[in-house]
């Protein structure tokens, strides 16, 4: 009996130990829990630290890459830099998921910047064929327009004909055609003298005359000597008369003959409207005049009554 009891106690003690071991494995002490939580937090902090450093480095590299691509404008160099930066960023951030995402974003930004720089360099370097054609057309048009402008300028620059006609003003009424012919014939041959006459006094002039010389030099000579000179004691004026430009006859445009409209049909013709003359003239209201007859009659009646008395 004693041996059986001793065996039972040993078995119970073994069972308790097993339970204690299991309970120790399943539920550790609070001190051990704190230690384990601290260790885990440290491990996480260590893992996050290289990830953050990798993201900061990637951002700085992206900015530097963009500046370099904008300044240089070469697509090949930007592509090589983006590939090297993406490989280095992927190697440094292989332990963390955030590092891998940032490396992929940086590689995308690098590829987009390289594509933009390549497109800008290609657009600035060589113009499209459509633009070249447009520029060539503009140049050809400008070349064709130049000779026309030169012709217009030559026409404008052509010297105006020198005047041969002189206007003489402020003449007295005593001066005649013979006097002007005698004075101005000393400067050259005179073609014509025009001296308009007053309408109401045909033997008197209007106070001015036109003298036309054969050569423009003679007209200039007469202007020099006679402008401000005196005829019949009065100072006269002499000025050149510019000949008008010959007017070009405009070509007449013959208008087509107008077609005569056919007469309207009989049933559409309206009867001729005759002006109705009023047979009886308009009656005017008679002007009322004061009649003195009744007053005279009264006077007569009174006189007759007085005579009868």
Curated annotation (Swiss-Prot):
Q: Name one GO molecular function term.
A: RNA binding
- Biased region (Basic residues) positions are 130-146, 154-166, 270-302
GO BP field: mRNA processing; RNA splicing
Q: Which InterPro entries does this UniProt record tie to the protein?
A: Nucleotide-bd_a/b_plait_sf, RBD_domain_sf, RNPS1_RRM, RRM_dom
Where is the sequence biased in composition, kind Low complexity?
Answer: 70-129
- UniProt key word RNA-binding: yes
Residue intervals of the RRM domain:
164-243
Can you name a GO cellular component term? nuclear speck
The protein's location, in the record's own words, is:
Nucleus; Nucleus speckle; Cytoplasm
Output compositional bias ranges, type Basic and acidic residues: 1-17, 35-61
**Region (Disordered) location:** 1-166, 249-309
For this UniProt record, give its keywords in alphabetical order, as a comma-separated list.
Cytoplasm, mRNA processing, mRNA splicing, Nucleus, RNA-binding
PROSITE patterns listed in its UniProt record:
RRM
Q: How does it assemble?
A: Component of the active spliceosome.
Similarity comment text for this entry: Belongs to the splicing factor SR family.
Q: Outline what the protein does.
A: Component of a splicing-dependent multiprotein exon junction complex (EJC) deposited at splice junction on mRNAs. The EJC is a dynamic structure consisting of a few core proteins and several more peripheral nuclear and cytoplasmic associated factors that join the complex only transiently either during EJC assembly or during subsequent mRNA metabolism. Putative component of the spliceosome which enhances the formation of the ATP-dependent A complex of the spliceosome. May participate in mRNA 3'-end cleavage. Also mediates increase of mRNA abundance and translational efficiency.
Protein name as catalogued? RNA-binding protein with serine-rich domain 1
What is the scientific name of the source organism?
Xenopus tropicalis (Western clawed frog)
Per the record, the gene is rnps1
């Amino acid at each position: 009996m004693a041996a059986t009891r001793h065996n039972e106690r040993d078995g119970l003690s073994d069972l308790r130990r097993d339970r204690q071991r299991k309970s120790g494995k399943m539920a550790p002490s609070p001190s051990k829990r704190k230690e384990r939580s601290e260790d885990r937090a440290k491990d996480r902090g260590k893992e996050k630290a290289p990830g953050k450093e990798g993201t900061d480095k990637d951002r700085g590299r992206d900015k530097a890459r963009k500046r370099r691509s904008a300044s240089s404008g070469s697509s090949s160099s930007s592509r090589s830099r983006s590939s090297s930066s993406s490989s280095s960023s992927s190697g440094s951030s292989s332990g963390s998921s955030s590092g891998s995402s940032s490396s992929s974003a940086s590689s995308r930004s690098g590829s987009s910047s390289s594509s933009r720089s390549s497109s800008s360099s290609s657009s600035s370097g060589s113009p499209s064929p459509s633009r070249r054609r447009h520029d060539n057309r503009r140049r050809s048009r400008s070349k064709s327009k130049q000779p026309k402008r030169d012709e217009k300028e030559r026409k404008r620059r052509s010297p105006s004909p020198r005047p041969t006609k002189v206007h003489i003003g402020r003449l007295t009424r005593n001066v005649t055609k013979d006097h002007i012919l005698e004075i101005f014939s000393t400067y050259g041959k005179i073609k014509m003298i025009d001296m308009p006459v007053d309408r109401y006094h045909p033997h008197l002039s209007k106070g001015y005359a036109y003298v036309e010389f054969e050569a423009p030099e003679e007209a200039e000579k007469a202007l020099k000597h006679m402008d401000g000179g005196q005829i019949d004691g009065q100072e006269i004026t002499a000025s050149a008369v510019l000949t008008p430009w010959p007017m070009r006859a405009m070509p007449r445009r013959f208008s087509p003959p107008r077609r005569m409209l056919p007469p309207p049909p009989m049933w559409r013709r309206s009867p001729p409207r005759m002006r109705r003359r009023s047979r009886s003239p308009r009656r005017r209201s008679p002007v009322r005049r004061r009649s003195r007859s009744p007053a005279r009659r009264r006077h007569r009646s009174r006189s007759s009554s007085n005579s009868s008395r």
